[in-house]
Amino acid sequence: MAKEMSDHQDSEHFTYDRSWGEIEQMLFEAELQMNKHNTEALAAVHKDNRIFHVRNYTALRGVVKTLRWVLGDIKVKDPLK
């Protein structure tokens, strides 16, 4: 009996029409936001504000790593590690 594919494996939900330029632009914007959150976290006086910026910085690190992997960055062997 065949297993049903999850939505990320079902190709009808994906267009696969992103250009390399779009991916590079997204990487550029993600790096800008990541750096902004890092700067804000370092400057934050209140703990809640610092936590907010660190959380967003950490999430964007994952985004940046994944986009670099998609673009073939030789320094990123596996974006999940």
Predicted features along the sequence, with ranges:
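Short, charge/polar-rich alpha-helical segments
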Residues: 4-32
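Short intrinsically disordered terminal tails
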Residues: 1-13, 72-81
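Short, charge-rich amphipathic interface segments used for partner binding and complex assembly
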Residues: 33-80
